[in-house]
Amino acid sequence: MPNLFSPFTLKGITLPNRIAMSPMTMYNSIDGKMDDYHVMYLGARAAGGFGLVFPEQVAITPEGRTTTTCAGIWNDDQIEGHARVTSIIKRMGGVPGIQLGHTGRKGSELPPHKGVNEQGSWKALAPDHPQGWTCVAPSAIPFGGDHSYPVHPLTRAEIKALHRSYADAARRAADAGYQWLEMHFAHGYLGASFWSPLANQRTDEYGGSFENRCRFPLEVAAAVAETIGADRRQFFLLNNSYPPLQKPRLNMF
């Protein structure tokens, strides 16, 4: 590990070292906004020496959150809080990164500090719960387990709208000062659901073959690149298999 503490440059962005703080949900946002808590916590991580600092997965739409206390960047009012976060990270010598995502059929949960289910995991909320909503997915197939409420299968028009939501979120992230962009297409969230032949049983151009199941993530990447510039590096968090509950592991490819 001789290079762990040496600088690293990619696409004109230089990290002071190779140590990154991964996105970790903090459940401390109101209306998706970053505030003093996030400035303090993330600034301290940069001051402690992390070269690349991510907040949590940041939702591109209100329904893309895990809980109502998760961060978002779906409207311009949220830019100011994110700008405060990127400013303190840079001041402390780090590079601010952002992970954009949509939880898909794994959203609408109760914040963990508010209670868990009998298995000790996060508790999914019914769509008619005051803090819940109807989750969306490629097909009308719930994730299962606690997430067994009906989900809404996305229409083509809604898929196109999500392309725009990702692109607009990326534009806001750039305006807020983030220098490193990652897209969360793993862990059973929306992007991963499109990859998965278990979750995605569509019969149109977004389902069926591997090429069709790749279409949504690739269209998102293209929309983002068109908005913020193809010269800006995008990174993707992917997984090639996912163990849905008690089912055997399934190769996505």
Q: What is each model feature region?
A:
Residues 1-20, 89:
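N-terminal amphipathic alpha-helix/helix-capping segment at the start of soluble metabolic enzymes
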Residues 19-22, 53-55, 96-100, 181-183, ...:
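Hydrophobic faces of well-ordered beta-strands that scaffold small-molecule active sites
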Residues 21, 45, 49, 89, ...:
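Conserved, mostly hydrophobic/aromatic
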Residues 24-36, 69-74, 103-110, 145-165, ...:
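Active-site mouth loops of central-metabolism enzymes
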Residues 39-61, 176-180:
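Catalytic domains of carbohydrate-active enzymes, especially glycoside hydrolases
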Residues 54-79, 100-120, 182-208, 242-245:
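Glycine-rich, proline-tolerant flexible connector loops at the mouths of alpha/beta enzymes
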Residues 71-96, 198-232:
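Alpha-helix-loop-beta-strand connector modules within alpha/beta enzyme cores
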Residues 87, 95, 101-172:
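Non-globular sequence segments
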